[in-house]
Swiss-Prot record:
Receptor for angiotensin II, a vasoconstricting peptide. Signals primarily via a non-canonical G-protein- and beta-arrestin independent pathways. Cooperates with MTUS1 to inhibit ERK2 activation and cell proliferation. The lineage of its organism: Eukaryota, Metazoa, Chordata, Craniata, Vertebrata. It is a multi-pass membrane protein. It comes from the Eukaryota. Keywords: Cell membrane, Disulfide bond, G-protein coupled receptor, Glycoprotein, Membrane, Receptor, Transducer, Transmembrane, Transmembrane helix. PANTHER family: CELL ADHESION MOLECULE (PTHR10489), TYPE-2 ANGIOTENSIN II RECEPTOR (PTHR10489:SF952). Belongs to the G-protein coupled receptor 1 family. One of its GO terms (cellular component) is external side of plasma membrane. SUPFAM superfamilies: Family A G protein-coupled receptor-like. It is found in: Cell membrane. Residues 323-332 are annotated as: Helix VIII. Disulfide bonds join C34-C289, C116-C194. Interacts with MTUS1. This is Type-2 angiotensin II receptor.
Amino acid sequence: MKANFSLATISKNITSSLHVGFVNISSNESTFNCSHKPSDKHLDAIPVLYYIIFGVGFLVNTIVVTLFCCQKGPKKVSSIYIFNLAVADLLLLATLPLWATYYSHRYDWIFGPVMCKVFGSFLTLNMFASIFFITCMSVDRYQSVIYPFLSQRRNPWQASYIVPLVWCMACLSSLPTFYFRDVRTIEYLGVNACIMAFPPEKYAQWSAGIALMKNILGFIIPLIFIATCYFGIRKHLLKTNSYGKNRITRDQVLKMAAAVVLAFIICWLPFHVLTFLDALAWMGVINSCEVIAVIDLALPFAILLGFTNSCINPFLYCFVGNRFQQKLRRVFRVPITWLQGKRENGSCGKSSSFREMETFVS
């Protein structure tokens, strides 16, 4: 499929969308020439790494979904969020084999325009859904530790309102991808690329706008909520006098809180920094071929790092808990009741905050 896109516009778009070099880039504000064809040797390892992430992530998230579906009785609010997070991560990871093939063919999309649009939108939708559910879980954990009495009144029906809202927000965030994603022929590279086919006359504006939207909705706002909640938990727990088992539980919670924040930052910060630099390039603020080359080289690996977040989420939110381990051994029904009774009967000196803390790490 051919289109009236300039070589400059298309070549830069592949880097922005899924990701080859910038060639003869121009915008309304600036014009500069990076005429060499970029090396793609660094892409050789990407497909293999994608398949590794797909295999590991699909396995661990399938375990989470299976255990949730097999669980009898009412579901906890936190469990509902974990389940939806695992579903979003599974759907995101399911697209990786296609993108691995895309990389192995050096950005030559062989699956047709419909699959390009569908799987491009699918990837964006579930990326946002995963990040939004991580944010919801952070708020839920903050409430359970800071306001334990109020949090005990939480019912699954409350999550039944929040979960559809989160999925709707993710769908709305992915609408530009669904509308613009298409296959375009790039004669310079000899490929049919799956790209964001913005109107040529407004290409720079659209590209910069979408990049900034990803930064704000996909990183800045969620990070504010996540960091605020977990730093609030840390501040609250450090004020609480704790001894013996309470102290061990508190330290576990603090470590988990730090791990969640650090994992989110490590996995997504590189991608969003490069996305922001890309937006600056479209706006004409950056016009250095050297900087463009760095973005071109680093973007595939930054995206790869972002996908690893879907692999480690089950470990951060589920696998470390005692209750998950009990479920995995298929003996959780009686032991959980006994354990809860033991906690209440054998810990008269515990505050409600520390009982909620034990739920946090269980």
